[in-house]
């Protein structure tokens, strides 16, 4: 069934689903390709706005407001496609297709002990991110749920090399409740890489974590939290390297092998696998596959 015979409602559903599948850094490319197929500017613009809003939340798209980094997520969504930034005290809409802030408005915040703690935690987290990530961004948000105060720390770094046919994203999120003596930190680390020269190869790895932190004062909590994040992300990075190395040595040999016609020619799979190297950015944690011989076989 072609798109031309679908109802408008079905077209909207298909377009949005395809756009939401776009890997980080490739949303605009996916949108432009779909525009060539759909040829309905009004329909594409509306669906692009809706899907772009969700894409920003899913992949923590970074912005810069008044010289400060802002990470978009569902934690700072206000509704009506608007986001809120604690640091600049502004609310705004973001057009991902045009990479443009729109309808910027001031938005006040309550200055209490939790807000002061948020600022202290952000300072400690920035020191860690600046030391470990080449182009990293971080943000700390406040949220109140059923009269309980929470801090949400987000970290993001990416390298989108479309010209080299690969993109990579590392992000993590850490949430803890503001308690007097002890709090539990819930975290999630996520890595995604996409290589698309001759072969379409996706890697997605994530891990959920739970750790406890003692609270003495604001400065101690901020430093302990930053050390916890550093320790857990270092462990995750080491585990990713180990697991992917094992995968490249064993599992990928079976996954990537395909039935070929009988040519009476011996295919040296070991030589192919030896060219399937893992590339690691030590401070960032991106993992991608190098190509060369592999790409000559998978077409």
UniProtKB/Swiss-Prot annotation:
Q: Which UniProt keywords apply?
A: Actin capping, Actin-binding, Phosphoprotein
Q: Which GO terms describe its biological process?
A: actin filament organization; barbed-end actin filament capping; cytoplasm organization; spermatid development
Alphabetized Pfam families for the sequence: F-actin_cap_A (PF01267)
In its UniProt entry, the species of origin is given as Macaca fascicularis (Crab-eating macaque)
Query: What's this protein's name?
Result: F-actin-capping protein subunit alpha-3
Give the family, as the similarity comment puts it: Belongs to the F-actin-capping protein alpha subunit family.
The source's domain of life comes to: Eukaryota
Per the record, the gene is: CAPZA3
Q: Does the keyword Phosphoprotein apply?
A: yes
* Residues with PTM Phosphoserine: 290
Q: What PROSITE patterns does the entry give?
A: F_ACTIN_CAPPING_A_1, F_ACTIN_CAPPING_A_2
């Amino acid at each position: 069934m072609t798109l031309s015979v679908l109802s408008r409602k079905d077209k909207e559903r298909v377009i949005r689903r395809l756009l939401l599948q776009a890997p980080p850094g490739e949303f605009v490319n996916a949108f432009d390709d779909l525009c060539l197929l759909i040829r309905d500017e009004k329909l594409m613009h509306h669906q692009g706005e809706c899907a772009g809003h969700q894409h920003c939340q899913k992949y923590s798209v970074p912005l810069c407001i008044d010289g400060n980094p802002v990470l978009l997520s569902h934690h700072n969504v206000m509704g009506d496609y608007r986001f809120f930034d604690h640091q600049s005290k502004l609310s705004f809409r973001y057009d991902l297709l045009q990479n443009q802030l729109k309808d910027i408005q001031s938005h006040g915040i309550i200055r209490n002990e939790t807000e002061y703690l948020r600022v202290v935690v952000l300072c400690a987290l920035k020191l860690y991110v600046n030391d470990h990530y080449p182009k990293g961004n971080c943000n700390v948000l406040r949220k109140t749920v059923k009269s309980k105060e929470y801090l949400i720390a987000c970290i993001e770094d990416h390298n989108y090399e479309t010209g080299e046919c690969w993109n990579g994203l590392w992000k993590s999120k850490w949430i803890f409740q503001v308690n007097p003596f002890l709090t539990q930190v819930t975290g999630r680390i996520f890595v995604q890489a996409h290589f698309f020269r001759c072969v379409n190869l996706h890697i997605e790895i994530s891990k959920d974590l739970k750790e406890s932190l003692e609270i003495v004062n604001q400065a101690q909590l901020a430093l302990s939290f930053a050390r916890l994040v550093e320790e857990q992300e270092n462990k995750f990075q080491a585990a990713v390297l180990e697991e992917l190395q094992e995968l490249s040595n064993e599992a990928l040999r079976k996954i990537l092998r395909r039935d070929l016609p009988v040519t009476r020619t011996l295919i040296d799979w070991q030589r192919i696998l030896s060219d399937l190297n893992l590339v690691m950015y030590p401070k960032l944690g991106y993992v991608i596959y190098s190509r060369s011989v592999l790409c000559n076989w998978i077409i």
